[in-house]
Amino acid sequence: MPRRVLQGQVISAKSDKTIIVSVERRFKHPMYHKTVKIAKKYAVHDPDNLYNQGDKVKIIESRPISKTKCWRVIEDKGQ
């Protein structure tokens, strides 16, 4: 099974070796035909504490690192 790759923005970098990334998803509501925007937060492994709040990053699914972390940062997309 291929690993999922998502793109999002760092909303918290307060924890050691962990960042919280918000990933936005847009879709058209089937009944109301309006574009709906949904955001989901992921705990992401950042071993070198390189990323700060507001950075755009690309994340990939990985093996479980802790109870809530199963994503890693693979690329920095700039600010």
Swiss-Prot record:
User: Source organism lineage?
Assistant: Bacteria, Pseudomonadati, Pseudomonadota, Alphaproteobacteria, Rickettsiales
Q: Which GO terms describe its cellular component?
A: cytosolic small ribosomal subunit
Q: How does it assemble?
A: Part of the 30S ribosomal subunit.
Q: Which family does it belong to?
A: Belongs to the universal ribosomal protein uS17 family.
Ordered alphabetically, the record's keywords are: Ribonucleoprotein, Ribosomal protein, RNA-binding, rRNA-binding
Q: Which domain of life is it from?
A: Bacteria
Function description: One of the primary rRNA binding proteins, it binds specifically to the 5'-end of 16S ribosomal RNA.
Under InterPro entries, the record lists: NA-bd_OB-fold, Ribosomal_uS17, Ribosomal_uS17_bact/chlr, Ribosomal_uS17_CS
**NCBIfam families found in the cross-reference section:** PRK05610.1 (NF004123), uS17_bact (TIGR03635)
- Gene Ontology BP terms: translation
GO MF terms, alphabetically ordered? rRNA binding; structural constituent of ribosome
Q: Which cysteines are joined by disulfide bonds?
A: none
Name of the protein this chain belongs to: Small ribosomal subunit protein uS17
Q: What PANTHER family does the record point to?
A: 40S RIBOSOMAL PROTEIN S11 FAMILY MEMBER, SMALL RIBOSOMAL SUBUNIT PROTEIN US17M
Signal sequence annotation: none
